[in-house]
Amino acid sequence: MEEASDWSAGQMCLTAPVPVLEEWVVARTAHYDRSFLSTDPTFAHAHLTVLAPWVPEPGVADLARVGEVLAAVPAFEVELTRVATFPDGLVHAVSEPDHGLRSLTRRLAAAFPDHPPYGGRYDATGGPVPHVTLDRLGPDVTEEWVRAEVGHLLPARLVVDRVDLQWWGNDTCRRLHSWRLGA
């Protein structure tokens, strides 16, 4: 039987897919918790979070509002330049420049003020830092190890031209909707 601490009710997330890191992120997800592997072939495990947690049960008006916001934003490029670690031990790929992603997050957060990025956890520090989660520091995981493992994939240029609505939950991860930027 699952321990309560190992189970998640889940959350809605607005994300931008990062295909170049998909294989790595899927492998690391499988290493830690296979229940977060999606069987949905359109689901992007490797992603840049744009806004999460988002509306728990979005309606037609919520989806339309996201579409309106994204229609006003043209596609833009970012580069995943290097591996770094946040103070909490989250090892990630740094996205530079990050102004396009920050702007996208600000626009969506303004459209949904009851759903601040990461629940408002990073408001005092200027907002969340756009990144792709790669791993977490631990006895067998160092930043140097992750850098050596993904070094051949970085730097990587990425065109952010789509935002997906994803459901993240144990054994239920899936893509629910997708919007093109500037469309």
Go through each PLM region and give its residues.
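Basic, often amphipathic N-terminal segments
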Residues: 1-77, 98-159, 174-183
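Conserved TIR/SEFIR loop-to-helix hotspot centered on a Trp-containing motif
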Residues: 83
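Short histidine-centered catalytic/ligand-binding loop motif
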Residues: 91-97
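Short acidic/glycine-enriched loop/turn segments that link adjacent beta-strands
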Residues: 86-89, 172
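Active-site/acyl-donor-binding loops of N-acyltransferases
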Residues: 166
